[in-house]
Amino acid sequence: MIPRPADSLREGFSKWTDDFNEIRGLFSEMLEEEGDADLAAFLRSCFDDACAPRELAALPAEYCQALSIVFQLLDIVEENTANQVRRRAEDPRRQEGEPGLWLYNLSDLRQRGFSEAALRSAMDQTSVEPVLTAHPTEAKRATVLEHHRAIYLLLVERDNRRFTEVEAAIFRRRLKAALERLWRTGEIRSERPEVESEVQGVLHYLRWVFPDVVELLDQRFQHSWSAVFGTAPPNLPKLAFGSWVGGDRDGHPLVTPEVTARTLVLLRQGALAVARERLRQLGARLSLAESEVPVPEMLCDRIAILSRILGAEVARKAIDRNPREPWRQLINLMLARLERVDNADGYASASEWIEDFEVLETSLVEAGARNVAEMDVRPAIAQARVFGFHLATLDIRQNSQYHDRAMAGLLRAAGFAKHDFPNWSEAEKLEFLNRELQTLRPFTGPHMNLDPEAAHVTALFRELRMHLSTKGPEGLGPVIVSMTRGVADLLVVYLLAREGGLLVETEGGLACELAVAPLFETIRDLENSAGILDKFLSHPVSIRRPVNDVVVMLGYSDSNKDGGVLCSQWSLHQAERELTAVAKKHNTRLTFFHGRGGTVGRGAGPTHVFLEALPQGSLTGKMRVTEQGEVIAQKYANRVTATFQLERLLAGVTRTTLLHSVRPQGDTHELESIWPRVVEISFKTYRKLVETDGFVTFFRQATPIDAIEQTQLGSRPSHRSGAGTLDDLRAIPWVFSWSQARFHLPGWYGVGTALDWLRRERIDDWKQLREQVRVWPFLSYLLHNAEASLMMAHPGLMRLYASLVEDEALSARLFETIFEEYKLSESVIEELLGNSATRRSRLALAVRLRRGALDQLHQEQVRLLRAWRREPKEDTLTALLLTVNAIGMGQKMTG
């Protein structure tokens, strides 16, 4: 990878700090004009190096809100700066380029010897699907995000315009007004959001952001391909979107079958709205007249075909609307069929619709209007391929234990004497499932009284059956079984689906019309995953599935919470390698679904580096990846940023797929032989901590987890079943709590002891590790992520939060254990990688700019935690939640 030249970094840092100082100065000026001179002075003391910090006995609520807003402004400035720096890097005169994007990757692949034909083939094989999920600790309200976008667009306007003196003065007032609107908008949710409002949040991106982004993506791909190869580009690699919002019911009782059915309707309505809008835009542009342009026969033929399908009256209206303008006439006919999409004369599928688009494109090229075809119609085709008539696939996720209880309810209703299905052994379950999966006979009828779990699952599958029968399979993602512990957890879904009519008779026997996907989350489940998948793919019902693909989801969050970051990452790495071999054995195309979150403790990290670190041969062109709550807003709220993120993902998956295709599958690094022992030490170190007597007490008192559980940040409860145990706690609030207390423990704990053992006991291996750390992508990725967590941690604040633990002996003992591991982790990583602040200058600057203000907020949060735990008043909780929100903004993460 070619590093970006130092002068670009210096320019970027200079612009970042200058713009931040300017916009926060304007915010302070606005506060002073409103009579808040003391608050303005306080803000200067928090962010100006020249001003001494102000020590306050308590922070008023508006001070916390003001700090939160300044953090938001810093993020907006950083995003705009990054986009401007990338734009400059793409200037051919600078000869820099942006690593990870199409132009860079295509050039790199060509230099490596890949032919144009090989790349065209790879484009056909590549499929990338970001899956949008709700986030139980997403802190930003939709209204606040709208204000953020308005401010961002003002900064973009300023950078791309030359103002007169009058225009500059007016612009300054516009920016100040935008800041005032943000300042006067409440940030804390007054009540927990409904699932329906979260669905609308996802629809916003799918309906209003991504369609424009797809057009930009296609245009940038066309330019890059032509620049590298000088030939007509192939189609953009397949991009699709998925969603969990309205379909993910794991520990979420508010996601009912009715909510899922309504979500599918909303997604389809959104897709058709996007389609109509695109056709109308094309109709406005394609005014080519038959008197000026030769009309290809294929265009006339298609107009005649659609006219016959629609009937004389409808066709006449469509054609008469634009006499002597045949391209518009075809568009009018396409619009008419689109409006009748649920009728016999409407489009039966999106593929039919795309065929008509292709006629538009080809006929324009044939008529000599190639530029119009490439700039107007080709992006419309790209959009149609992405969104179809479904907008995004909706995944259905449920916990394996819930399915077991549902099965028990069905057995009870059917009169089985032995109906305690959750307590059966794996062998008993398999014997029963194999027998039952030979018949279409359901257990229950439509009007039988069922236990809640059985009633829910049966109603859900009936809704999915209805959708499949009327709309087709395109809008449905897989049924994901979280906490998959054995093959019975997957096969039971087939049997439950039978109750909804989703098992069908084929020539060879029964098959299920829904894809079923395991989700492996704990360390043990990852270790057993290959054996489970092998048995699943060997089952007759699986063999007869409609498509010879399988999706396997990997849980980064829970595996980290279970075994620590080093053990988690290695277990995932090994599982991918073994699962890939199983899929190859069954001649099945495997799609890994990476359940990565927004923090290191939940699998985050730069996309292109993450792809490089994947096991050889594990990426065969298809990838799904979660995009969660706060990450969705950070990556996709603004179109330029969204285009960059998706281009890097598409280009990166294409590049990695090609590189994997020419290297031996299972190819290992020479250092891997020592790694199992390192992982074992890390795992034991981490488990020793979380299993220590009193650890749960320490966690609950030294972090604001109890306050976080009171927030209204997301519709999902923070615990799966309400048990209140550490095992039952979701990974997101677990990570969020540690980040609020500035431990960032899930991102680094266990790394220090494990690598220090190598440094002390295996000196030659340690020396080799130091020499090769940057050429083993897996290790480099892991250590860089752990390093980032260590840079975000703050020992002084860690100690302050530990002082909240009532048992002083427990506090001292566990804090000392954690702090020693922190120092050890810092030591080994610095010895392997070098000085963090020097190498990670952007992150170091981000931490430095936020430090003074965050210190004030942490002090206030600790004070409020003491007061609230002593006397739980509502106004104290409200103030406490303001600090939770502000600290989350300040660290740019909510778990």
Predicted regions located by residue number:
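Catalytic or ion-translocation cores adjacent to nucleophile or general acid/base/metal-coordination motifs
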Residues: V255-L286, G500-K684
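Active-site cores of enzymes that catalyze phosphoryl transfer or operate on phosphate-rich substrates
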Residues: A392-D395, N399-L491, L495, E499-E507, ...
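Extended, charged alpha-helical coiled-coil/arm scaffolds that mediate oligomerization and mechanical coupling
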Residues: D345-E358, T362-G368, V372-R385, H390-Q398
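Conserved phosphate/anionic-ligand binding catalytic regions in large, soluble enzymes, centered on
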Residues: L239-T260, D376-H403, E521-D525, F593-H608
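Generic, well-ordered alpha-helical scaffold segments in large soluble proteins
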Residues: L26, V209-A227, V274, R278-R285, ...
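Glycine- and acidic
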Residues: I188-R207, P257, N343-Y347, V359-E366, ...
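Acidic, glycine-enriched catalytic cores built around paired aspartates
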Residues: I2-S68, E79-Y104, P237, R385, ...
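Extended, highly charged
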Residues: I2-L236, E258-A350, I354, L394-R397, ...
